[in-house]
A protein has these predicted regions:
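Helix-loop "lid/cap" segments that line or gate small-molecule binding pockets
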Residues: 112-120
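Alpha-helical interface subdomain recognition
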Residues: 11-104, 120-124, 131, 135-136, ...
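A generic local secondary-structure boundary/capping motif
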Residues: 128-130, 147, 156-158, 172-176, ...
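Cytochrome P450 C-terminal beta-domain/meander region
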Residues: 151-169
Length: 398
């Protein structure tokens, strides 16, 4: 019989893996337990399958429930209705989301959009952050363009002066959860050439603004995304987030927070896959014995367990890296964590499917759904080639 112990980060009351290495206070531990109970009581694969087949791809009641738990404002300032937490608190939420495979605009709203508005400050932050913390406002960030290949500074969308404001023209791609967003943060070029770092300005655009057209679709993991065309979209000067021409720094900081958050989500998903595969190997019989008694498969499960532990370390490292003041060191640590998470995620997903045999490929089994999500995480905010190049450049700059 397979003798590997249960994952050390399992809540014995409900079997939900969690990132206990992230916990620094008793409040964080209780928060994580509340999230685990919430998802265990309200969300599972059959429910998820129904939700992803309908619009908007998630249950608004679940969204309100998360807001009531304080998840939406966990990293937002207390002055604007948040909890004043940081990367570790966000990691706790994202770890629980990864374990449950909960699909929603949480990343785009609370982590990316809310973080950008908070960093930009001013009237926009005071006006919108309290509603985000209460779960009453959802955001999307249109950080990608068709030609950009993960380069945030590659912005062809233009923002030209138009009376008392600006006129936006351009295209954005794979804008996460734009279909359910109340407003979209749009980077546009107010000065400079297409790949210049200076000259990018962030605008908060109401999702129903005339000239903003969407083509909505589902991604392979059941999330929602849109390709957006901006045709003469008019916004006032009050829509500018932060400083004119200085939006790239806000966007890059948001992407790094997004990577750290996704690392925690991936670690939670991998923990679930390990537990599910371990339980299957202890019950599935072949040749008159449970397959967990076969030494070759035990060795593979040890590798999966080791990968899960390494993923937790990578997630913790990414959260810690957000506090690094040196840009080159921060870039190196964030990209290093992303490379590690992507590699480990592929390994754990592939092994979990293979160890389940043919049924591992079916839609009825949960492991395939987690594998798809890990695949999408691997492609978010830069793939392996992009982050290898970024890591190398940061090493040379050190």
């Amino acid at each position: 019989m397979l003798s590997l112990s249960k994952h050390e980060d399992i809540d014995e009351r409900n079997g939900v893996p969690r990132l206990t290495s992230i916990f620094r206070t008793d409040d964080q531990k209780m928060f994580a337990e509340s999230l685990a109970r919430f998802f265990a009581a309200n969300y599972d694969i059959p429910k998820r399958r129904k939700l992803v087949a309908s619009e908007p791809g998630y249950d608004p009641a679940h969204w309100r429930g998360l807001a009531e738990l304080g998840a939406m404002g966990v990293a937002l300032p207390e002055a604007h209705g948040g909890s004043g937490g940081g990367p570790f608190d966000t990691a706790i939420v994202m770890g629980a989301i990864g374990t449950s495979l909960f699909g929603s605009p949480y990343l785009s709203t609370a982590v990316l959009g809310g973080g950008i508005l908070d960093a930009g400050g001013g009237v926009l932050a005071a006006r919108h952050l309290p509603a985000i913390a209460e779960g009453k406002r959802k955001l999307s960030v249109a950080y990608a363009e068709p030609q950009a290949r993960y380069h945030l500074e590659d912005v062809a969308t233009s923002a030209r002066p138009d009376g008392a404001g600006y006129r936006l023209e351009g295209k954005k791609s794979v804008v996460l959860h734009a279909s359910s967003a109340d407003a979209i943060i749009v980077p546009a070029r107010t000065a400079g050439g297409q790949r210049e770092r200076r000259g990018i300005t962030l605008f908060l655009v109401d999702a129903k603004t005339a000239g903003l057209d969407r083509r909505d679709y589902a991604t392979i993991d059941g999330q929602r995304a849109s390709d957006i065309t901006l045709s003469g979209v008019r916004v006032g000067k009050e829509a500018v987030i932060g400083e004119t021409d200085g939006g790239l720094a806000l966007l890059e900081a948001a992407a790094e927070r997004g990577i750290a958050a996704l690392a925690a989500e991936a670690a939670g998903a991998m923990g679930y896959l390990y537990e599910t595969t371990l339980a299957y190997m202890k019950t599935r019989k072949q040749f008159g014995a449970t397959i967990g008694s076969f030494q070759a498969l035990q060795h593979r499960m040890v590798d999966v367990f080791t990968a899960c532990e390494s993923a937790k370390s990578a997630a913790l490292g990414a959260a810690l890296a957000l506090g690094e003041r040196d840009p080159a060191a921060r870039a190196r640590r964030i990209s290093g964590a992303k490379l590690q998470i992507d590699k480990l995620g592929r390994h754990v997903a592939q092994e979990s499917i293979q160890l389940h045999g043919g049924m591992g490929m079916t839609d009825e089994l949960s492991v395939g759904h987690y594998a798809k999500r890990l695949t999408m995480i691997g492609l978010s905010f830069g793939d392996t080639n992009f982050h290898m190049a970024r890591y190398t450049a940061a090493m040379r700059a050190a």
